[in-house]
Each structure stands twice: as C-alpha cells, then as structure tokens.
Amino acid sequence: MIVLKWVFPVSLAVLAIVHLVSCWRGDDDLRKPTKVALMPVVALSYLAFARQPSIWVVAGLLFGCLGDLFLLWPLKKKFFALGTSSFFLGHVCYLIFIYTHYVIRVSWIWIVVVSAIYAAGVVVVYSRSRKSIPRALRPLSLMYMLMLCVLSVSLILPLLTAFWWGKLVAFFGATFFLASDGVLCDMLFVKKAEPTPVSYTHLTLPTNS
C-alpha cells in the first residue's frame, strides 16, 4: 500500500515534465490535455499523503482543473470569464483551509504594512494594464487580482506567526501564481496571444497538510 501511493506523485512528476516540454516545444496537442490532467493527479497525490486531508484543498484543486479546462480557449471572453471564476472559487476554498488550520498571531502593524505593500502593487499593476483589458472583463480581472493578493497575504501572516517549511512553500506557490497570471494577462491582453504558464500554487499548497 505504501508503494502504491507513490504512483501518484511519480505520475505527477512525469506529467509535469511532459507538460513543460510540450509548452517549450509549442505542442498544443500534448500541452492542453496534460494541463487539464495535472490538478486531478495533484489531488490524488494530496489524498495519498496528507495525514488529515481537507475537503477544501481537494475542492480548490478541482476548481483549478475546471479553470485549466476553460482557459484552453483564453481568447474567448466567455471561457476566460468561466476559467477566472473557477480559479477564484478555488482560492476561496484555499482561504477557508488556511483560516481553519493556521493560527495567526501577529501585530496589527504587520497586517497593515503587508496589506499596504500589496495594495500599492495592485494600484500600479492594474493602472498600467487596465486599458488593455476589455471593459467587460475589468471588474472580474480586478477582483481576481485582489483575490491573489489576499491569498498571498493570508499565507504570509501564519508564516510570521510561526515558521514552518510547508507554509513557506505555500507562500512561494502563491507568489508564483501572481507572476504566472501577470504573464498570462500580458500575453492575453497586450500581445493578444494564447499563454502557456503553469499554475504553481496548485502544486505547492497541498504540501501543507
């Protein structure tokens, strides 16, 4: 049984490598199915190794799978909206997991400082990209940007409360997600091209259980 559960992370590693190689080669016939398959395999790996699996983490990963599926057609506004909404709901699930599993005991000054830094970043990034984003998608894009910042801040605060490597990995995952979606936004709305970034948050958050 112990050997059997390693099938999932090994499969995930192989799948991730194949996906990255297909992105590098521009092979959409391989990139698209491997992208959609990533999150279910992450969920299986999480369930196999987590001491106390959380339904919220599993739900977040499955919403991520839906997001990946819809964003196979990112240049179509309807699918972009559905994909972004799916990821948004996934992040809500992650937030529920964070605030029901982590203890946060930090001075309010830290909360204000960290939040102010992220708020300033949102103002700068959104003000620069706003004109490139279709008007109908601007509210959703802003809400999603704020959600990514809330997720990142929500991972910093437990880390400041008590250091743990799992928290650090999850924080880096959220940071990769911010960077990945920044590239996605630039390619979609500025360069008008289909992006191929990988969602690292989904690969790192499950390490926390």
Model-predicted regions and their roles:
Residues T201-T207:
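Conserved small/polar residues in nucleotide/adenosyl-binding loops
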Residues F189-Y200:
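Interfacial loop-to-transmembrane junctions
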Residues M1-K5, S45-W56, I96-I109, I156-V169:
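Helix-coil boundary and interhelical linker segments in multi-pass alpha-helical membrane proteins
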